[in-house]
């Protein structure tokens, strides 16, 4: 779900490659095919709601909903491009 040009909420079961392509990102995982799995890999534990991951590309991923051992929703905030002249 698109909130604006920089903010999205996606299902944890969403395909990682599809999310990356759709948002123009470079999220990759050797072991997982979903955005939820990607978050698990980065955190190395089952996250709680509102846990945050910052990627090397300065993309913020916040866990929006967890059900038992599954990430249900992930909030994604893309970095805004730097203003020219700053």
Q: Model-predicted segments: where are they?
A:
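Cytosolic regulatory modules rich in charged/polar residues
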Residues: 1-86
């Amino acid at each position: 779900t698109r909130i604006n040009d920089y903010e999205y909420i996606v299902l944890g079961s969403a395909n990682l490659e599809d999310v990356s392509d759709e948002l123009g990102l470079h999220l990759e995982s050797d072991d997982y095919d979903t955005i939820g799995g990607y978050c698990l890999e980065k955190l190395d534990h089952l996250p709680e709601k509102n846990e945050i991951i910052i990627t090397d590309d300065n993309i913020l991923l916040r866990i929006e909903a967890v059900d038992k051992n599954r990430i249900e929703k992930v909030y994604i905030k893309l970095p805004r491009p730097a203003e020219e002249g700053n």
